[in-house]
């Protein structure tokens, strides 16, 4: 089954029912980690090649903590149209898309558009991952001091991808 002629039956089955690509291939366990290198950690716009070590590190975390295979895709474009087109054309090879270190405000449009055109989960880590961690930390801190979230005011400093998403998640 590793190669011809054994792969013909799965190929024909997927042709008839494309959703079988998730069970008859590695697709369901493969995530693309996508960046344009414009908001890499605290380093800023360092470019896609310089962002590769971070993307490789994220791929290693996927493997170590979830046994998910991940592949870095560092795109040499800051144009949302080109990024969306490139990722959407490659989406058939993956079970999910993890957007990483793409600067605001373009990251919002890119994520939204990819969610509209891809039939797999699309997640911008800098927005939602950070917001979930902040929400968990806030709820735990409130539990420690014995307060309800309705009793406090929360200040968010920054209006980048993380700050805006934190605000949206806390509302």
Please annotate each region the language model reported.
Residues 41, 46-66, 124, 132-171:
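Glycine-rich phosphate/diphosphate-binding loop of Rossmann-like nucleotide-binding domains
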Residues 1-122:
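N-terminal ligand-binding/catalytic initiation module
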Residues 127:
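Acidic, His- and aromatic-enriched active-site or binding-groove loops in soluble protein domains
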